[in-house]
Amino acid sequence: MKYQGKSTRKATGGRLRLNRSKRKFELGRDFTIPVIGAQKLKVLNVTGNGSKVRVLKSDVVNVTDPKTGKTQKVKMTTVTENPANKNYVRRNFLTKGTFVTTELGKARITNRPGQDGCINAVLVA
């Protein structure tokens, strides 16, 4: 868990004394980076009696062909390029903007799979 409230230090390095203690709603979660593998989802309970679905592993992607407008669910094999971090390619991490190899060809991921619960992509010529 990450504390996302106000810091206890000033810009000069001096100590700030908080008027109150830390609250539960000020906590955040560590980010999850999905990888290519057998489908594995995680359901999280959130404030307001809701839930979020996160992708931990997935080997399928919803690919849209921009020329025809058709969307298909296809298998992906590897990550070919990742503008976020070159080391993510070696570890097959799936982030927004990642280029993956699918059965239909090369595709670019358009959503944030760690937050959406599915993986959407657009076919690249």
From Swiss-Prot:
Q: Name one GO biological process term.
A: translation
Q: Which family does it belong to?
A: Belongs to the eukaryotic ribosomal protein eS8 family.
Q: Please give the PROSITE patterns that the UniProt record associates with this protein.
A: RIBOSOMAL_S8E
Q: Does the keyword Ribosomal protein apply?
A: yes
* GO cellular component labels: ribonucleoprotein complex; ribosome
Question: Organism's domain of life?
Answer: Archaea
- In which organism is this protein found? Methanocella arvoryzae (strain DSM 22066 / NBRC 105507 / MRE50)
- Do you know which InterPro entries this protein is assigned to? Ribosomal_eS8, Ribosomal_eS8_CS, Ribosomal_protein_eS8_arc, Ribosomal_Se8/biogenesis_NSA2
> How does it associate, per the subunit comment?
Part of the 30S ribosomal subunit.
Q: Which CDD domains match?
A: Ribosomal_S8e
What keywords appear on the UniProt entry?
Ribonucleoprotein, Ribosomal protein
Any idea what this protein is called?
A: Small ribosomal subunit protein eS8
What Gene Ontology terms describe what this protein does at the molecular function level? structural constituent of ribosome
